Amino acid sequence: MRFIVTGNKRAADWGAVYIVKKIKEFNPSPEKKFVLGLPTGSTPLQMYKRLIQFNKEGIISFKNVITFNMDEYVGLPKTHPQSYHYYMYNNFFNHIDIDKENVNILNGMAKNYKEECRKYEEKILEVGGIDLFLGGVGVDGHIAFNEPGSSFKSRTREKQLTEDTIIVNSRFFNNDITKVPQSALTVGVSTIMDAKEVLIMVEGNNKARALHMGIEEGINHMWTISALQLHEKAIIVADEDACAELKVATYKYYKDIEKKNYNIDKLIENLYKK
């Protein structure tokens, strides 16, 4: 597992640069599309802003990219301002050159949630699997809506949300926890781990314990982030604030071996060089 330390609030920028790098290396075509797994939430917003910039400036195209989002609230229509459909189109898809037929998001209003989840997994297999899955992490270490205690063998399914997650997410619902959906459709831990690469972005002091548990402690189903230790090509990129609970030796070790990769401004500059 790789671990990259960036400046504060720059993990999302690093993620954007890495997406561009991987798509360019893949060199997608209409016959061979790049498959990207995408998150929602606060941390990825800057990543999407940066990717929109790169797209408008001709640095990258999404015409031959297929996307699968991680999750969606149960019971929210696509037009609801807090649905992840609304989030993705408003903050990303409406501003880039992606073919909307290549966008895949779970339907929180489906008549049969089990069937919706089964078809989602089936479609991922049909396109050859996910090449790169992006994600954030919750304060309790959850990825997507794989809350503490989620099976590492889990697949896309409906998942009940913990009280902590509902309270945290209430900030998007006028701080009214009664308006927050009680469950969501989410890709499973195995769905994420099956991706060829996984990149998790961690920003802020409130994520410091989750980062510590994911990197320095053993694999534990109560900390979903720790499953990444089992992935052959997992990357965690975190800002300085998120490193607050790491051992000094761990911090210094990764800063040293990844010293060529944490100067985000230099990495962005390199994208503009032909």
Curated annotation (Swiss-Prot):
Summary of the function given for this chain in its UniProt record? Catalyzes the reversible isomerization-deamination of glucosamine 6-phosphate (GlcN6P) to form fructose 6-phosphate (Fru6P) and ammonium ion.
Q: What InterPro entries does this protein map onto?
A: Glc/Gal-6P_isomerase, Glucosamine6P_isomerase, Glucosamine6P_isomerase_CS, NagB/RpiA_transferase-like
Q: Recorded GO terms, molecular function?
A: glucosamine-6-phosphate deaminase activity; identical protein binding
One GO cellular component term of this record is: cytoplasm
Extract the signal peptide range. Answer: none
Keywords for this entry?
Carbohydrate metabolism, Hydrolase
Pathway it works in: Amino-sugar metabolism; N-acetylneuraminate degradation; D-fructose 6-phosphate from N-acetylneuraminate: step 5/5
UniProt xrefs under PROSITE patterns: GLC_GALNAC_ISOMERASE
Organism, as annotated: Fusobacterium nucleatum subsp. nucleatum (strain ATCC 25586 / DSM 15643 / BCRC 10681 / CIP 101130 / JCM 8532 / KCTC 2640 / LMG 13131 / VPI 4355)
User: Which reaction(s) does the protein catalyse, per the Swiss-Prot or TrEMBL entry?
Assistant: alpha-D-glucosamine 6-phosphate + H2O = beta-D-fructose 6-phosphate + NH4(+)
Per the record, the GO terms for biological process are: carbohydrate metabolic process; glucosamine catabolic process; N-acetylglucosamine catabolic process; N-acetylneuraminate catabolic process
The annotated active site, in chain numbering, is: 71, 140, 142, 147
- One Pfam family name is Glucosamine_iso
The organism's taxonomic lineage, starting at the top: Bacteria, Fusobacteriati, Fusobacteriota, Fusobacteriia, Fusobacteriales
Task: Look up the EC number in the record and give it.
Answer: 3.5.99.6
Protein's recorded name: Glucosamine-6-phosphate deaminase
Protein family membership: Belongs to the glucosamine/galactosamine-6-phosphate isomerase family. NagB subfamily.
